[in-house]
């Protein structure tokens, strides 16, 4: 099952609204508001690569999101 962290930069003042929307997406396990270059970190786990692609596309298309950086987890201990 593919898992990834997605770092998200969003429009100023929109982080809380974006997190609410992210929580409603199947496959989203955790949503964290952070400080720094990125505003939000999301942990996702899906059934297969196609589901991962669809979820990432859905996130990238959200109006308040400026950019994303995806880190696919290759090993977990």
What does each model-found stretch correspond to?
Residues 1-77:
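A compositional/biophysical signature of low hydrophobicity enriched in polar/charged and small residues
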